[in-house]
């Protein structure tokens, strides 16, 4: 008997959702370019689902929007929460139509290992803790990037970028002795520097997911 050439299995992936809140493509392009300039490595090449709930009653050229995003190296896999007219456009463009629903309950994750870094992480450096939590005894400087599939604990200042829960774990957290980050992300939900400025702290703080947003908690020293 010959071996199977393929096998179809059900699985799940963590995808970022881009919420379109304006049908003006010129305004969209300008705002998107600004965000991309702040964190290009976080966005470029990332698969996205487009949420069209806010523009479902407007005349949106989905083909032009797709071109706008692809020109910026963003990969569009489908749309969600769209009007029948936009769904028809999406199918003509070969995009998936994804139904919005409650998040499925995930199985408990196995206990992770911990990757420990006993030095400062400097500009241009990237550290990735695959299938592990990341503990840094030092600061994460401007232009540095730290990524973990689990949580990130920084015993110093966070001034660069920190991305926890990279494998999709919503329960991951980011803890730092002071929070002055360029970007923080937990399982695809992110804040850029402009949002973080109102939360910048010289005290020990924890960032965690709060539904479809993030929240900051001050911790005891």
Curated annotation (Swiss-Prot):
Record's subunit section: Interacts with MinD and FtsZ.
Protein name: Probable septum site-determining protein MinC
Keyword annotations of the record: Cell cycle, Cell division, Septation
Pfam families: MinC_C, MinC_N
Biological role stated in the UniProt entry: Cell division inhibitor that blocks the formation of polar Z ring septums. Rapidly oscillates between the poles of the cell to destabilize FtsZ filaments that have formed before they mature into polar Z rings. Prevents FtsZ polymerization.
Similarity comment: Belongs to the MinC family.
Biological process according to GO: cell morphogenesis; division septum assembly; regulation of cell division; regulation of cell septum assembly
Hydrolase found in the keyword field: no
InterPro entries to which the protein is assigned, alphabetical: CAP/MinC_C, MinC, MinC_C_sf, MinC_N, Septum_form_inhib_MinC_C
Family annotation (HAMAP family): MinC
């Amino acid at each position: 008997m010959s071996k199977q050439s393929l096998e179809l299995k059900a699985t799940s992936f963590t995808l970022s959702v881009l919420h379109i809140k304006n049908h003006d493509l010129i305004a969209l392009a300008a705002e998107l370019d600004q965000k991309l300039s702040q964190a290009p490595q976080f966005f470029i090449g990332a698969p996205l689902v487009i949420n069209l709930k806010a523009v479902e009653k407007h005349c949106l050229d989905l083909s032009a929007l797709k071109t706008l995003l692809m020109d910026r190296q963003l990969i569009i896999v489908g749309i969600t929460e769209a009007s029948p007219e936009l769904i028809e456009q999406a199918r003509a463009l070969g995009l998936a139509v994804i139904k919005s629903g409650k998040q499925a309950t995930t199985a408990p994750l196995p206990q992770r290992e911990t990757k420990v870094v006993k030095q400062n992480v400097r500009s241009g450096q990237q550290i990735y803790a695959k299938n592990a939590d990341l503990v840094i005894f030092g600061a994460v400087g401007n232009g540095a990037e730290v990524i973990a599939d689990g949580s990130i604990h920084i015993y110093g200042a966070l001034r660069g970028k920190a991305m926890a829960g990279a494998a999709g774990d919503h329960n991951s957290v980011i803890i730092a002795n002071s929070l002055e980050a360029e970007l923080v992300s937990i399982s695809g939900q992110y804040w850029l520097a402009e949002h973080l400025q109102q939360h910048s702290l010289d005290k020990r703080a924890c960032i965690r997911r709060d539904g479809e947003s993030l929240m900051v908690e001050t911790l005891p020293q």
